[in-house]
Regions:
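Extracellular/periplasmic carbohydrate-active domains that bind, remodel
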Residues: 1-558
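Sequence-structural signature of mature extracellular/luminal beta-sheet repeat domains
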Residues: 556-713
């Protein structure tokens, strides 16, 4: 039921009294991005605490019952994130799963016959990390369907006390015995495994166990509790309206300067200028579907041609908590980034939605549909034939950069108007993602560039029909990353397949634990390969993998001879490369016009890297005397603005029909310059100036390789 999006139950205690042997406390078969948190259930003589678990469960404790959780697939077949849980006294098993796709972090199961049981005749994808089994008298885990390619089991750092048998294979009756009274299973892998991209995947069962003296308590410090409510200040009490019309910008800015914990009730809060938090600022929203921070379409602070500009920014090294809000940059705000996150390892973002997906609730020209129950506006960015020029006009929704890290839980970033749902760049600060869904983007769902020391649990990609050419995950110059329960899904409306779910460039020490690359049952168009490495031409063809390791030591599939004068294939897979340019060190740059990407071929290493991904169509490239990269773009002025990015009051802020064609858009050349080693932070618009200001230019560039129209240069 699509109406159950963002349903939630939290801060509740439930008790089933005697005489209810078939009773279960909660049936949690929600649609998407729903949660149960801070809930304690006493099942007693009843059947189960939770049946048909939803997408996210956190801080739950279940006592008694036949089962603590009894679940099938969540809707719509996503993985299930179970974080910080406690089970005790179940009569059959703490958890019973049938293709649940559970990702379990920090679970403690005590005084039960079985901790986790996979149902008979069913493959499953199970990942567990940092868990405790105590007094589990039959077996820790019951496995099944050993020969099925979809069986993917990975268990890491499972501490056991009084668990004589760690695992049992149901049909073969093979047993994995425990060691000593107290021991730790450091690694357990069961299913198709590839130790590198050069390996042919084979079904394995690997166990690494070591004795320990005692159980170490579970550390939940990376998901801190909110401050006490007595310490909160209600933004409404400071004068904020939240009506979708009034300008609440300065009230928010003043609140950040004065208060540490700002509570935001439901409402549509118009924020017209960037909001930057202090080191200790916490933003606490009531609900991510109804507590909206909105920048109206055509907002000058986020409009026009230029460097990324964030609605919300956290400071470097901050310990911020941001939760329960919806960041919405409307449809037309070319420079917009919803959130630029630079807070440190101790920071925390959870239960946050990023704009998009709800096409009927947008704003323009002072009009709004502030109440979701109001009739949708007659003017939207979408045309009658569902072709939208607004799509892919903004920067990334969530941008984690400049040493940003911390924990991110239960995030939904589904926005056709942004160039990617998640962009992580230039950070080796440890980070963790506990459940994130990325959907509906046109070119990229997620990009990691120069990132290290992150763990990503429950990464869910839903590539929609508008994203027929979308790369789900791009990893560029990354190392020491772990992905657990990686789901890449292409919907039934797809008309063709896509080359890869994961694309890598110059990466090493990347581990995928449980890879599920699939399409809807009604179609066969999924991603051809689960992973493709650009520079080695190596790929993981299998769609279902228990474990896949990218070591970074893989050799090229087709070695280069280094013979002078011989043409050889270096890299492939581009749509239409253009704009070749060379810097003083021999590095070569090129671009893809439609896909809006810029690449570098390093003269020393011979490796190709994706270096930039901005929402403008690059036409030609050049290098100046200081090796800055100059980019010529085909720029379409933002609706409501002139070509020079000044406001045009005679034009609406959404699409219009005019003499320039169906949409009345005119193409004009715009130029910017970047440093290739960090384009995002060095983006500089190059203004049009009078040549008389430069009597003796050092270098003159004529972009003769390709033009937009005959008269534009």
């Amino acid at each position: 039921n699509a109406g159950t999006f963002y349903s939630s139950m939290m801060n509740v205690d439930i008790r089933i009294e005697g005489g209810n042997p078939n009773a279960s406390a909660i049936r949690a078969h929600f649609a998407q991005h729903c949660s149960i948190s801070n809930v304690t259930i006493h099942v007693g003589k009843g059947r189960a605490g939770i049946v048909d678990a939803g997408n996210h469960l956190e801080n739950i404790a279940i006592y008694g019952g036949e089962y603590g959780i009894d679940t099938d697939k969540s809707a719509p077949g996503w993985p299930i994130m179970l974080l910080n849980s406690y089970f005790e006294g179940q009569r059959k098993s703490a958890i019973l799963t049938n293709e649940g796709g559970l990702t379990i972090v920090r679970m403690r199961a005590k005084n039960v016959p079985v901790a986790v049981e996979i149902k008979e005749n069913a493959p499953d994808r199970l990942f567990m990390e940092d868990c405790i089994f105590e007094n589990v008298h039959r077996t820790g885990v019951i496995l099944t369907d050993a020969g099925n390619a979809a069986t993917q089991i990975n268990l890491r750092n499972i501490q056991c006390k009084n668990v004589p048998m760690f695992a049992l294979e149901r049909f073969t009756n093979q047993q994995i015995p425990g060691k000593e009274k107290t021991y730790r299973v450091t690694r357990f892998t069961f299913g198709f495994n590839a130790d590198s991209l050069e390996d042919t995947p084979q079904i394995v069962r690997r166990t690494e166990t070591e004795p320990i003296k005692s159980i170490t308590p579970l550390d939940t410090g990376d998901t801190p509790m909110l401050p006490a409510t007595e310490q909160w200040i209600n933004i409404r009490n400071l004068g904020a309206k939240g009506d979708g019309f009034s300008d609440d910008t300065h009230i928010f800015q003043e609140a950040v300067q004065k208060y540490a914990n700002i509570y935001i009730p439901q409402g549509w809060y118009v924020v017209k200028e960037p909001l930057t938090l202090k080191q200790n600022t916490n933003l606490i929203g009531l609900h991510p579907g109804t507590t909206i921070l909105l920048s109206l379409g055509g907002n000058p602070a986020f409009s026009g041609f230029g460097a990324p500009q964030a609605q919300l920014t956290t400071p470097q090294g901050g310990k911020n908590i941001v939760c329960g809000i919806f960041l919405n940059a409307d449809a037309y705000n070319y420079r917009a980034v919803n959130c630029k996150w630079m807070a440190g390892e101790g920071s925390y973002m959870y239960d946050v939605k990023f704009s998009g997906h709800d096409k009927a609730r947008f704003f323009h020209n002072g009009q709004s549909a502030a109440n979701p129950l109001e009739k949708p506006m007659s003017i939207t960015p979408e045309t009658h034939d569902l072709i939208t020029r607004a799509w892919d006009n903004q920067h990334w929704s969530l941008w984690i950069t400049n040493g940003g890290g911390g924990s991110f839980r239960d995030i939904w970033t589904a926005n056709e108007y942004s160039s990617a749902g998640l962009y992580i760049s230039h950070t080796d600060t440890p980070g963790r993602i506990y459940g994130m869904s990325l959907e509906h983007h046109l070119r990229n769902e997620a990009i990691f560039r120069n990132v290290a020391n992150w763990k990503i649990y429950d990464f869910q990609f839903e590539v929609e029909a508008e994203g027929i050419d979308t790369q789900p995950l791009d990893l560029i110059d990354c190392k020491n990353l772990t992905f657990a329960n990686f789901y890449s899904y292409r919907v039934s409306r797809m008309l063709k397949s896509y080359p890869s779910a994961i694309r890598t460039w110059n990466c090493k020490d990347i581990e995928f634990l449980n890879v599920h690359n699939y399409a809807h049952a009604r179609v066969k168009f999924t991603s051809n390969a689960s992973l493709y490495d650009v520079n080695t031409h190596r790929e993981a063809r299998r769609w279902e993998l228990a474990r896949l390791s990218l070591t970074g030591k893989e050799s090229r599939k087709y070695p280069l001879s280094q013979e002078k004068g011989k043409a050889e294939l270096v890299v492939t897979g581009f749509e239409f490369i253009d704009g070749l340019a060379q810097d003083s060190r021999g590095n070569i740059y090129f671009c893809e016009h439609r896909m809006r990407r810029i690449y570098k071929l390093d003269a020393r290493s011979g490796q190709v890297t994706s270096i930039a991904d901005f929402p403008w169509n690059a036409v030609a490239l050049a290098c100046d005397t200081q090796d800055n990269l100059i980019v010529v773009t085909k720029y379409i002025s933002q609706p409501g603005y002139n070509n020079d990015d000044t406001r045009n009051g005679n034009r609406p802020l959404f699409g219009w029909k005019g003499s320039g064609g169906l949409w009345g858009f005119n193409y004009v050349p715009k130029l910017y310059a970047i440093r290739p080693d960090n384009p995002d932070e060095s983006f500089q618009v190059l203004p049009l100036v009078d040549m008389k200001q430069f009597a003796a230019p050092q270098q003159i560039y004529y972009p003769g390789n390709r033009t937009i129209t005959q008269s534009e240069y």
